[in-house]
């Protein structure tokens, strides 16, 4: 992380920070700076991941166009693998959602949190009223 900065430079920055900010504000400043650095690293990594994903999609698209121009016959193994990946991705997108079968034996009564909260509120309101 500190490739171009040596130990003496870091020590000088620390001493200057201590003199300028003081001992009370220096730890807070260091924490906020490290938070900013972490946020920038996360943003850079997410941008890098998105670019890699877009490049992969673009490569698959180019392979598909190349395979289409060859008539889907006598394809190289790389092109055939790309087509197989595209087919599996298309099947996963077109696959309907799996609906889980809920049997009545598994649950004895329907769960409804709203009436329970209302009953709790009514009970607490009734306990606060004076009797008489």
From Swiss-Prot:
GO terms for biological process: protein transport by the Tat complex. It is a single-pass membrane protein. Residues 117-132 have a biased composition (Polar residues). GO terms for cellular component: TAT protein transport complex. Its main location: membrane. InterPro entries: TatA/B/E, TatB. One of its GO terms (molecular function) is protein transmembrane transporter activity. Pfam families: TatA_B_E. The chain crosses the membrane at residues 2-22. Keywords: Cell inner membrane, Cell membrane, Membrane, Protein transport, Translocation, Transmembrane, Transmembrane helix, Transport. The keyword Ion transport does not apply. It is found in: Cell inner membrane. Residues 103-115 have a biased composition (Low complexity). Residues 86-132 are annotated as: Disordered. The keyword Ion transport does not apply. Belongs to the TatB family. The Tat system comprises two distinct complexes: a TatABC complex, containing multiple copies of TatA, TatB and TatC subunits, and a separate TatA complex, containing only TatA subunits. Substrates initially bind to the TatABC complex, which probably triggers association of the separate TatA complex to form the active translocon. Part of the twin-arginine translocation (Tat) system that transports large folded proteins containing a characteristic twin-arginine motif in their signal peptide across membranes. Together with TatC, TatB is part of a receptor directly interacting with Tat signal peptides. TatB may form an oligomeric binding site that transiently accommodates folded Tat precursor proteins before their translocation. This is Sec-independent protein translocase protein TatB. It comes from Shewanella sediminis (strain HAW-EB3).
């Amino acid at each position: 992380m500190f490739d171009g900065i040596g130990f003496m430079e870091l020590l000088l920055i620390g001493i200057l920070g201590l003199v300028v900010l003081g001992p009370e504000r220096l730890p807070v400043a260091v924490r906020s700076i490290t938070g900013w650095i972490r946020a920038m690293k996360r943003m850079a990594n997410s941008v890098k991941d998105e670019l890699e994903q877009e490049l992969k999609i673009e490569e698959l698209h180019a392979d598909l166009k190349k395979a289409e121009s060859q008539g889907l016959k006598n394809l190289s193994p790389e092109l055939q693998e790309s087509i197989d990946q595209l087919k599996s991705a298309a099947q996963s997108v077109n696959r309907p959602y799996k609906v889980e079968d809920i049997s009545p034996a598994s649950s004895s009564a329907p769960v409804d949190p709203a009436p329970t909260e209302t009953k709790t509120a009514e009970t607490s309101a009734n306990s606060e009223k004076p009797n008489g």
